[in-house]
């Protein structure tokens, strides 16, 4: 879908969402981490951070714990409810060795919503890899083959795929009464509803609210605060690859079943607030590494030619990879707005997404780059590559929840 990116985003803004039956649960890697206690109260925990639009959540970990537990049981999250963790692949073993050599202790294969053994009518993981392309056997939890088929089996559920909501209707009291949508054949319908649930991810959710303006809601529905579309976040991310002395074959096995959790603490003495995880990340193929290492690494071997062939292609089986992910700062200037003139195939203004890194994000990423490189060096790597963030993957914010 056409969209416009600005700031630190690529102009065409590729968003890693999945516009398909099952949504982004088809594409996700399955990592299922809880908020830490201090993350629910970011404003109180971090204080006044210049340029950040921090706010405490109106809920805390104690209130959310039972809901976390219910979700983990439903999804079969490893490391919870007596469910064994997934076995580590070579990519994890390399990271684990280096991390423990440096003194890290909280290192394991994580809490993954991927069956480590048969459960809930689904098989255990076969370690096929490429989890983000969809799970061929259904070991990874996704609504595509869990909740949606179960709902269809009741006879009281109708799935209308390839439909696009144009706007949300409301009554004189301002309560939503249904939606106007276009079906797969291009026909427009009005669907009345007692309840309208909006779950379009961090770009399409504010977009439909902003497109639902009316005389009662001139700035868009549910936008009395003026915060709809604002505070777009994507996590602090970055990637470190290391060329190891032996074969790794990091494309084999569960993609992100491996994590170092020691750095997720909130320790401002490191030069930033909040913390980050180091998680295993596989190769996405030689072509993808050409586009990432070749294009963006400071110490780049190039995207093609002899240096690229020698450093990347010939060493592909020896490469290990990790993803760095931490909390980024919400900023009011980062967000989703509607384009003034450019329209999509439905006649709706395309979304404009603006994002700029906060200084805290940059400081955290630099610390994480060094830590990740040190992990691989401790494992025997002589060469590490530090890659900037992917354009947009963990899309968050834009519809803020607060106490009032």
Model-derived features: where do they sit?
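FAD cofactor-binding and catalytic pocket of flavoenzymes
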Residues: 2-24, 39, 48, 57-60, ...
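Conserved redox-cofactor binding core of oxidoreductases
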Residues: 5-11, 36-39, 44-165, 391
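N-terminal accessory/precursor segments of enzymes
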Residues: 22-47, 190
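Short, solvent-exposed loop/turn and secondary-structure capping segments
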Residues: 29-31, 39-40, 118-120, 207-212
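Cytochrome P450 core scaffold surrounding the K-helix E-X-X-R motif
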Residues: 36-45, 170, 207, 335
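Generic, well-ordered alpha-helical scaffold segments in large soluble proteins
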Residues: 67-74, 98, 102, 154, ...
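A glycine-rich dinucleotide-binding beta-alpha-beta segment and adjacent secondary-structure elements
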Residues: 108-110, 123-131, 166-171, 317-328, ...
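Glycine-rich loop(s) and the adjacent beta-strand/alpha-helix scaffold that form part
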Residues: 154, 163, 167-173, 179-252
């Amino acid at each position: 879908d056409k969209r416009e990116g600005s700031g630190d985003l690529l102009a065409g803004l590729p968003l890693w969402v999945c516009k398909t039956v099952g949504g982004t649960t088809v594409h996700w890697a399955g990592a299922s981490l809880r908020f830490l206690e201090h993350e629910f109260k970011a404003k109180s925990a971090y204080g006044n951070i210049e340029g950040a639009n921090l706010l405490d959540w109106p809920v805390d970990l104690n209130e959310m714990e039972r809901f976390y537990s219910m979700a983990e049981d439903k999804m079969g999250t490893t490391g919870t409810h007596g469910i064994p963790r997934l076995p580590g692949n070579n990519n994890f073993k390399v990271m684990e060795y280096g991390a423990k050599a440096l003194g890290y202790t909280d290192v394991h294969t994580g809490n993954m919503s991927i069956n480590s053994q048969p459960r809930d009518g689904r098989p255990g993981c076969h370690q096929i890899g490429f989890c983000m392309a969809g799970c061929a056997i259904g070991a990874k939890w996704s609504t595509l083959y869990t909740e949606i088929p179960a709902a269809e089996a009741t006879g009281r559920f109708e799935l209308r795929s390839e439909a696009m909501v144009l706007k949300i209707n409301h009554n004189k009291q301002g309560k939503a009464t249904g939606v106007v949508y276009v079906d797969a054949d291009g026909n427009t319908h009005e669907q009345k509803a007692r309840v309208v649930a909006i779950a379009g991810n961090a770009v399409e959710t504010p977009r439909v609210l902003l497109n639902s303006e009316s005389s009662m809601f001139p700035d868009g529905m549910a936008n009395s605060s003026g915060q709809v579309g604002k505070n777009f976040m994507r996590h602090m991310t970055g990637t470190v690859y290391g060329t190891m002395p032996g074969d790794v074959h990091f494309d084999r096995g569960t993609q992100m079943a491996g994590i170092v959790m020691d750095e997720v603490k909130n320790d401002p003495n490191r030069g930033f607030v909040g913390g980050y995880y180091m998680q295993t990340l596989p190769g996405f193929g030689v072509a993808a590494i050409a586009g990432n290492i070749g294009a963006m690494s400071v110490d780049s071997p190039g995207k093609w030619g002899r240096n690229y062939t020698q450093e990347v292609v010939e060493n592909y089986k020896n490469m290990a990879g990790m993803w760095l992910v931490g909390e980024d700062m919400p900023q009011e200037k980062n967000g989703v707005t509607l384009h003034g003139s450019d329209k999509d195939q439905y006649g709706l203004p395309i979304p404009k997404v603006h994002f700029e890194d906060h200084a805290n994000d940059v400081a955290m990423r630099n610390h994480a780059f060094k830590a990740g490189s040190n992990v691989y060096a401790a494992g025997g790597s002589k060469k590490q590559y530090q890659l900037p963030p992917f354009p947009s993957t963990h899309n968050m914010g834009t519809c803020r929840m607060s106490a009032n």
